[in-house]
Regions:
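Domain-level signal for soluble alpha/beta catalytic cores
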Residues: 1-121
């Protein structure tokens, strides 16, 4: 998981992603998940700059947020169609695999599928 309050490309424990660059060598894909859907494009772009061109990126945003007092809170604050529009932005930023993480539903994935069908025509 990447930290949304830190600069782009920083894990929750404060470790910058670039410190893992050598570990990515030979990977078929590297994924980012459990990041708020609206902020994921920037993270995908950052990761894309760290990877070889033949490495796919998986992007799985969430619908919810972390609360320091009660922990994780799922929310339906992002409608499936809006989430799908974010997923298209992740693709534009370099993701080749998109899906959903915490708080997403089958309706969310269906909306992504529909948007991808529209885009491909």
């Amino acid at each position: 998981c990447l930290c949304e309050q830190e600069p782009v490309g920083v894990l929750l424990d404060g470790t910058p992603l670039h410190t893992f660059s050598d570990s990515f060598k030979g990977a078929r894909f590297v994924g980012i998940n459990c990041v708020a859907a609206p902020t994921l494009s920037e993270q995908v772009s950052h990761l894309n700059n760290l990877l070889d061109d033949d490495v796919d990126i998986a992007a799985y945003g969430n619908v919810g947020y972390a609360d320091s007092k009660v922990g994780w809170i799922n929310t339906d604050a992002i409608e499936p169609e809006r989430y799908a529009s974010y997923a298209l932005q992740w693709i534009d930023s370099g993701a080749t695999i998109v899906g959903g993480c915490c708080g997403t539903t089958p309706e969310t994935i269906s909306a992504i599928h529909q948007q991808l069908k529209i885009r491909s025509t």
